[in-house]
């Protein structure tokens, strides 16, 4: 039992539209809609200028691949599958979207699970920018995604089994340490 509060207010008391404006999410399964890349990035920020959209994409490390597309930001993508974009490119567009939204709270749920190592590195750099100076919840199985976190909660069977920084958890020699060294070898 308990409650989740934002600035001391129980979220059950906050209107749903206000919550949506204050929480940005990048999920494992990225959703894009039919339209241009520009429109997909600007979703949720109807008054976004081209400069704001490009700046968000640059912060998300997406501008490079977008600029190389024949129509750049005006490239039309056809569906949730992203119309020919790789999983990593779709994730970078989703990250660009939440960069533009600039919400005080971020939820990143397995956002690197479907990408290759090189794309993961690019997404990691984007996450560093995205999570700077804001409350962020990062749900991850890839420990590289969370190593720089201020606090890591290790879950086991629905309960918090361990908590601490990366270094503290390695020193404890528990579940996190076992996972880390098994992935490292």
Residue ranges and their predicted role:
Residues 11, 20-29, 37-40, 54-60, ...:
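ABC-family ATPase nucleotide-binding domain "signature/switch" substructure
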Residues 171-185:
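C-terminal boundary and immediately downstream tail of ABC-type ATPase nucleotide-binding domains
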Residues 42-50:
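ABC-type ATPase nucleotide-binding domains, specifically the catalytic core motifs of the NBD
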Residues 34:
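The conserved phosphate-sensing helix
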Residues 63-70, 176:
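Conserved H-loop
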Residues 2-9, 19:
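Conserved ABC transporter NBD signature motif
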């Amino acid at each position: 039992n308990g409650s989740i509060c934002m600035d001391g207010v129980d979220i059950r008391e906050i209107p749903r539209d206000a919550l949506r404006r204050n929480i940005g999410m990048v999920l494992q399964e990225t959703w894009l809609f039919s339209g241009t890349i520009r429109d997909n990035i600007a979703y949720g920020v109807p008054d976004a200028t081209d400069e704001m959209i490009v700046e968000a994409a640059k912060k998300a490390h997406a501008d490079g691949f977008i600029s190389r597309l024949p129509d750049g930001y005006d490239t039309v993508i056809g569906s949730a599958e992203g119309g020919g974009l790789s999983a990593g490119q779709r994730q970078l567009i989703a990250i660009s979207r939440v960069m533009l939204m600039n919400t005080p709270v971020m939820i990143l749920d397995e956002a690197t699970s479907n990408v290759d190592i090189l794309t993961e590195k690019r997404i990691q750099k984007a996450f560093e920018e995205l999570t700077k100076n804001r409350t962020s919840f990062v749900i991850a199985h890839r420990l590289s995604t969370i190593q720089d976190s201020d606090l890591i909660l290790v879950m086991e069977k629905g309960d918090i089994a361990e908590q601490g920084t990366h270094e503290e958890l390695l020193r404890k020699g528990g579940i996190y340490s076992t996972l880390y060294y098994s992935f490292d070898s």
